[in-house]
Amino acid sequence: MASHTADADAKPDSDSQKLLNVLPVSLRLRTRPWWFPIQEVSNPLVLYMEAWVAERVIGTDQAEISEIEWMCQALLTVDSVNSGNLAEITIFGQPSAQTRMKNILLNMAAWHKENELQRAVKVKEVEEFLKIRASSILSKLSKKGLKLAGFPLPLEGRETQMES
């Protein structure tokens, strides 16, 4: 019994501690879920997606993966490729689950791209509106000879003031 107590109180071996310090820390270290059969790990489906789209679909720090996995009964791994510009998504599971997962991810990616495009168009429209509005306000002020604090008069307004 004394030997068991001594083993429990002993410090860890320095070689094993060095080995643990050398190993890279992965964000996705985990055990296989109880519902996922081990045979399904052998034939993964791999797809590539732009990194910003993958981040929106899967969430920052891959927060949505467990919910997506449970919903489709397939496992996902996401790795950064091409210096962070692409995301490699590996899908493990039955072929039907892989196809379902791929379709869901691609549809979500298409939705996010379309949403981003619509947002960019709206921003462009707002910028154009503000430019037009600001120029009309400045032209009205220059006609009246007024000046907004911090805003110089338009070029034609300066010339008329210098001549008089």
Curated annotation (Swiss-Prot):
Location(s) in or outside the cell: Cytoplasm; Nucleus
Recorded GO CC terms: apical part of cell; cell cortex; cytoplasmic lattice; nucleus; protein-containing complex; subcortical maternal complex
Tissue specificity of this protein: Expressed in ovaries, where it is restricted to growing oocytes, with greatest levels in fully grown oocytes.
Pfam families: MOEP19 (PF16005)
Domain KH: 44-105
Any one biological process term the GO annotation gives: regulation of cell division
Chief location: cytoplasm
Keyword entries, A-Z: Cytoplasm, Nucleus
MF terms (GO), sorted A to Z: RNA binding; structural constituent of cytoplasmic lattice
Induction data: Induced by etoposide.
Traits of the deletion mutant: Embryonic death at 2.5 dpc. Progression from embryonic 1- to 2-cell stage delayed 6-8 hours. Less than 20% of the embryos progress beyond 2-cell stage. Embryos form unequal sized blastomeres due to smaller, dysmorphic, and displaced mitotic spindles resulting in asymmetric division. Decrease in thickness of subcortical F-actin in zygotes, thickening of F-actin bundles in the cytoplasm and loss of F-actin cytoplasmic lattices. Decrease in CFL1/Cofilin-1 expression in the subcortex and diffused distribution in the cytoplasm of zygotes.
Cytoplasm keyword on record: yes
Coiled coil: none
Keyword Ribonucleoprotein (UniProt): no
Domain of life: Eukaryota
Complex and partners: Component of the subcortical maternal complex (SCMC), at least composed of NLRP5, KHDC3, OOEP, and TLE6. Within the complex, interacts with NLRP5, KHDC3 and TLE6. The SCMC may facilitate translocation of its components between the nuclear and cytoplasmic compartments. As part of the SCMC interacts with the SCMC-associated protein NLRP4F. Forms a scaffold complex with KHDC3/FILIA, and interacts with BLM and TRIM25 at DNA replication forks.
Family under the similarity heading: Belongs to the KHDC1 family.
Domain notes per entry: Contains an atypical KH domain with amino acid changes at critical sites, suggesting that it may not bind RNA.
Function (record text): Component of the subcortical maternal complex (SCMC), a multiprotein complex that plays a key role in early embryonic development. The SCMC complex is a structural constituent of cytoplasmic lattices, which consist in fibrous structures found in the cytoplasm of oocytes and preimplantation embryos. They are required to store maternal proteins critical for embryonic development, such as proteins that control epigenetic reprogramming of the preimplantation embryo, and prevent their degradation or activation.
Name of the protein: Oocyte-expressed protein homolog
Organism: Mus musculus (Mouse)
